[in-house]
Amino acid sequence: MTSPFTTTRRELIARTGMAAAAIGLAGHPALSVLAQHGIPQRPIPSSGEMLPVIGLGASKVVAQIADNGTEPVANVLRALVAHGGKLIDTWPRNAANDAGFGRVLSLPELEGKLFVTTKIDQVGKDAGLQQFRDTQRHYGRDVLDLVQIFSLTDLDTHWPSLQSFKAEGAARYIGVTVAQDSQHDDLEQFLRREQPDFVQMNYSITERAVEERLLPFAADRGVAVVINRPFMNGAYFDRLEGKELPAWAGDFGCETWAQFSLKYILANPHFTCVLTETSNPAHMEENLLTAAGPLPNEAQRRRMREFIATV
């Protein structure tokens, strides 16, 4: 079972300062907030366990282990942990990549400091069970923090299996994921009849379909919400290429387009953790520091929505 995050405040301050200097953020106002309070955290409703509000969506960087080795993902995870982050969201790929990721999880500086999630994406009960057991073996973990059904795949078959994993102590939490607006109705129906610990859904400044109903509904049901696609898998940056960040974004400490979307999400009270996918430790650090800085109020969020509608 994953241990609680144990970095001391003194260690956090020291690591934050070194990392910030490396990426040109020394003296940034968010650093003082981070040093005093750490990354903001929110509770998992079913247990009260706290999670930092920024996590790593690691499907791409883990999928590159067989070609690029383990050091790229290890470096991103070191940056995550150094700033108080802990959630890493994964998706089984193949034996070579997953076994390599297991070696990363066993590194002394990372062992016991990560909240590791995985997914089942197979059709059929036996295939799902085998995928879960393979993940346990490759990751070197008898207990996985969170097991999710990817995109509601074969939901009625796999959900009883996940409930068994949790009852047996092989999974601490269980849930489901979606990443497309077309799946939101099915997710809502699932939430009306079942009580997962977690759901994962797409949400950003440019994908706001869940904002008015599904996101607050999940929170009202006592379900932790993990946000994916904060940058629309890169399409967000393509849309804004060549556009200047409005000067008024500086009123809430926003300096980049990445921060523009992240700060919009972070100001929403109904989510638990937002996944940022990167293979660059400096970008991981910037994302974590964004969470420690000022956030837009509702009037500013409305202005953000109006601006995005024009580009």
Language-model regions, residue ranges each:
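Alpha-helix-loop-beta-strand connector modules within alpha/beta enzyme cores
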Residues: 102-117
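Active-site mouth loops of central-metabolism enzymes
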Residues: 59-70, 119-125, 251
